[in-house]
Amino acid sequence: MRIARDTRRRSVKAGLPAALLVLLLAVFAVGCGGSDDSATGSGTDSSGGGKLDVVGYSTPEAVYTEALEPAFEESSKGSGVSFSNSFGASGDQSRAVAAGQPASIVHFSQAGDMERLVEEGEIVAKDWDQNQYKGIAQNSVVVFVVRKGNPEGLESFDDLQSKDVEIITPNPFSSGSARWNIMAVYGNAIEAGKSPDQALDEVRTVLEKTVAQPGSGRDALSAFTQGQGDVLLSYENEAIKAEEEGEDVEYVVPPATLQIETPIAVTKDAPEPAAQDFLDFIWSDEGQEIWAENGYRPVNPKLVDEKQFPTPKDLFHIADFGGWGKVNDEFFDDETGSVAEIEKELGVSTSG
């Protein structure tokens, strides 16, 4: 049974007496002539642990709102803590926080979006990644989501080169997940012994076959399940979610693929200790088990079930290409990036 479903049930059961308590307190306040302090969001009482603004990339929204947050609220350190949530394309979310959107916890799909907040006013501390998990909340891998039965017979990234298929992947200038996808294509070629120029040619071929580039990973999944394309490049967890929700799809883990690492941090103005307590909960065994039961690979190696999450034969990492700082400059810089140049030639927006 999925932990997310268990947590939702616990949350509902716990919420009934809480609702009665709120009602009784409201009646008491009116009876005593107290004033009504209206506010947006869920808020907390004066003795509570504060309100946390979670800003994240699109795909883990349900894990937060239906599992992680309710479970934390039921813990001793989460008592009195409430949440406000904002989820969307990773790059858009990062830019919004840099522009002033309130955020206590930020969770993006790639480290470049986190580094933006370090560089612009140190909204996030420079040492955000200096812990045993290097600031990573959970892992995944790049997979193919295909129609039931895999009618095109897609097994590896090489098949995307040789077969006449319509591909869906998000726009890499708004979506972090798309950058993982593109680097998986590139990395597969490099791992096979091809030159950087040859690898970039394979990226070009994939983008030429791409029939839709939605703004986020979640939007890309929606486009695919609504009938567009033959194959979707996606996070493994999104593929698992689609299968569990009864979509007429299945997924393939290529033998050579890229590990996805999603960074998380507290912001400098986050209410403490609530923000750090929630971050610690996300890294706790309970938090990591919630991620695992929702299709994400735990960062704690002791909690990884090899039957559920078998290690691909050739698993490579973004660090193999110099890390996101180098990768973003070389491939995704709007003015000089090689992928940006390809996208512009194809008439795709690179403005983010």
Predicted regions and their residues:
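N-terminal segment of the mature folded domain
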Residues: 37, 41-174, 314-317
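Short helix-loop capping/hinge motifs at secondary-structure junctions, enriched
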Residues: 124, 149-155, 174, 187-195, ...
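C-terminal motif of bacterial Sec signal peptides marking the signal peptidase cleavage site
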Residues: 27-31
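Ligand-binding cleft/hinge of the Venus flytrap
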Residues: 70-77, 158-218
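Short beta-strand->loop
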Residues: 126-137, 157-158, 243-258, 266-267
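Ligand-binding pocket segment of bilobal, Venus flytrap-like solute-binding proteins
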Residues: 192-255, 263
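Extracytoplasmic/periplasmic substrate-recognition and gating elements
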Residues: 247-289
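Extracellular/periplasmic juxtamembrane helices and adjacent flexible linkers that interface
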Residues: 6, 34, 273-352
